[in-house]
Amino acid sequence: MQMDEQNAAEVLSGSEAGQLVEAALASGADARFEVGGASMAPTIGPGDVVTVRPASAEDIRVGDVVFYRRSDGSGHVLHRVLWKRHTAGKWVLRTKGDALRSLDPLVAGDQVLGRSTTGASRARAWRGLIRVCGYAAVS
């Protein structure tokens, strides 16, 4: 299912909940919260509860689902990492919601607050199912 960027619900954007999650991660604690948007469907949907573990950009791998602060401070996002580069001594990530067509603006390493442990495992399971179905169709 593809969604237009305009129809995608924001994840914790501008809410006090996002600030609480950020504070928990900054203290070194894992944070659990209910996702409000559909930008990561079908892997993570509205109402799903995710666990986010503190992580720096250096710890992040391509394919991880990361929780980060928007560069303008207007809220927080939970999206998948498409690529990661180390340039001029700093990390830069490209992220995108699974259900969105458009890419997110570049994410600076210092915007990254954590990695979803829940969403990451579900995402791997989803990709594994696609591989199995694809193999069965080709065989």
List where the protein language model places each region.
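Extended hydrophobic leader/signal-anchor segments used for secretion and membrane insertion
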Residues: 1-139
